[in-house]
Amino acid sequence: MFKRPLCEMASGLILGILFMRYQKWYLAAVAAGILFGIVWNLWHNTIRNCSEKDSMANARAWMYPAFRVGCFLAFFLAGIFHFAENEAFRQNYMSKLQDGMQVTVQGKLCSKQLKNGQYSYYLDHCYLSIGQEILPCNQILFYQTSDDDSIGQTLIVTGTVELWKSASNDGNFDAKAFYESKKIDFQLKEAIVKNVYGAEDGFGEKIYRLRRKISGVYETCMSASDTGVLSTMTLGEKNLLDAEVKQMYQKAGISHVLAISGLHISVIGMGLYKLLRKIKCSFLTSGVIAGTVIGGYGMMSGLGTSTIRAVLMFFVLLFGQWIGRSYDSLSALGLSAIVILLDNPYLLWYAGFLLSFAAVLGIVAVGQTLIKIKKPFFTFSENFLVSFAIQLATVPLTAYFFYEVPVWSMLINFFVLPIIGVLLFLGLLGGFVGLLSVRVAGILFVPCHWILVFYEKVCRLSVSLPGAVWITGQPDWQKLLLFYLILGAVLFAMKKMKQRRGFVFIGCFMLLAVLHNPVKGFELDVLDVGQGDGMYLHTKEGTNFFFDGGSTDVSKVGTYRMLPFLKAKGVKKIDYWIVSHTDADHISGLKEILQAEYEIDHIVFSKYVLNDEAYQELLALAQTYGTEILKMDCGDIFTDGEAGLRCIFPDQTYKSDDKNALSLVLRYEDQEFSGIFTGDISSAEEQYLVEHKKVGSVTFYKAAHHGSRYSNSRDFLMALSPEITTISCGENNRYGHPGEEALCNIKESGSAVYETMECGRIRIRMENGKPVVEKFLEGR
């Protein structure tokens, strides 16, 4: 890096952005370290060799180092001021916006996408009208049922502001962070286009129409599954991609082939450039034609971050060819980072940006170093080293953003990548030919179909192998930083030293350290699942319990909230999944998690659970996925070292035909902590427990029936006198949970109250014998 000014400038810009965002001293220390490295490198290679007699030569020798140091400092300051300017610009209008506010927006239509039967319209160069104020703002997103407007036209739109929601549990999709990284701060609901004026962007609209037509050719000539994959792979059209197929590619570790990136640009762009050079076109003519085609292709595929990076690097390569200079990948990568981040500094927190740049760094910095050291004789060996380098560079980030890594991905890529060029070439050729002749296109798509069938077979085989996916949990960012610093030091040492075998073990140890993120000690997490229940308990002995898990107002709560939470925590399996009763708001997520083939050893019911349709469905799912069924009677206990989880209700004397009334009630207790889990019992069952002296004081109380006014009775709470009470309910739910009477009774008992709809996930840990509560949404 210290021999590449563009990389130094990019590093300065990145550190400046990070310093302004977090304002931490260690970021300034890293910048100072890089600056010292630049100065030391220049002193070692340039300045110390200056002649004392030749003053002119000395002056020239000092000018270049001064320029390099000045550039680094300038870009460091540019990063600080650029991010500060963007933040001030955003806050100027965001501070005035609220959910549900009626506003009018004027902006230029810059992009359109068809998704789920609706057209997503993206406006840039926007002006926002709030009352009497008109403020410039970032991009706006809204949806239309028909595609009546053209790219480039200016639209005046009225609608209701919907601000993006932050994730409310660990591991959940954070819409606010995702869209803010793309400079889209809110969307308009119930949007009405009031006026349209201005000329369309003829080229942009034609490119969009061409994309839609080629996608239509795929739909006409291929199966739905093949269409989804090929449209995503060649056009960036993700709306047709089947969710199951996408997940299969991710688990197999080949989802990168679905993103328009350097692989696509090299196949198409370099293929065309070499063809033009072969037919004796000049460097300039070949470069202009290839560059124009790749620029147009980038626009047609949606100009994602990885696409922009690949296109910019390709342009640098073409420019180098034209002026007769060798191409340096790291310098091109540094220039790409500068251009992208000067346009949008928030992309520094976008997974696609980080993974794209990490993959190229893996190839160039790690892969080329390994190749120089090992000097492989065969292309196979060289490809293996490059693939290993990419994995080494990207796996920590994969673990950070997705909480699991595909174990066999390096092996699978050996089968997938050699024929990807054929698939892309025939797929695009067939798409264009299909505009003229669907029959000829169908012939070209036959090999594409069989390649995709082969990919599917390979993916399914890899997923079926033992330990196909390793749930890593989300590593701390400090671990990631340490990993990359040590990786750089190891590569430097491998270049300088002859004995290198030990460094391989260091690299493997580092990777394992990053990927090992177990839950430690006692922890209780009350998840935000909307109107429902879901709690995770990790004991000191390492046993994993989960209580209920469902929702009536959050769609696919198991898929999008509960399972990502468990993976982010690094929980590889649940030992005992407790089901209080079989209402949908307690089991809908559990069913999804079983269907996702996540490992659950046991599902635990009350001995007196009602034998209804929901219960039978759960039994069938458990049998299908190899989960054992256990039933607890009053007095039964799970022992776990010094801890115990005891069933205190229902017993054989309590009769009812109501699911809620027969909820399984459990008391957990260890040396420091005690808690009671109540399901959806009502005040009648609570009174029964008090009268039969089955309850006593506890540290933690899960409010019965989501804080219902018909539960959480005064006598029951006085008997429990909990230190901490949590209420799991959805925002603006139709049941009025939590009830005012319940809240009054809880507070009267002396308990602190925490609601998931306000706090997000609520975590309880023990420190020095006292419970400590952490709220996920605190400070967000």
What spans do the regions from the language model cover?
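Membrane-anchoring/interfacial helices and their immediately flanking loops
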Residues: 1-10, 402, 416-421, 434
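Aromatic-rich juxtamembrane segments at the membrane interface
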Residues: 2, 11, 181-313, 318, ...
